[in-house]
Amino acid sequence: LFTSAADTIARDGHIANKIGTFQIAILAKYFGIPYYVTGIPDQDKHSKDDIVIEMRDPQQVLSYRGIPNTVPEVKAIYPSFDVVPPHLISGVVTDKGVYVPYLLDHYFDSDVKKFY
């Protein structure tokens, strides 16, 4: 079993989490290991298109302590989060129960009271 929290959970089942989560989710799927995300779906995030990924300064990966670690021609991008598609997620564990990622809209229809 592989589990993680999520910084953002869109209603279409896409999640945003720290860099590396997408790669681990791919490996989990490949090796048949279930991946469960813990968190509360974001009501205003209907799809992956609503997830904004902050881009960090690429110089942070092109140098170490101000010393370049690559040739000047190399360019980089440095996103702060990965987006994981729902087909890699076995379920989303919420305060109202476990949901299939493709059915997260049902979370907002549920009459179960929140625990917080």
Model-derived features: positions:
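Conserved phosphate- and dinucleotide-binding cores of soluble alpha/beta proteins
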Residues: 1-116
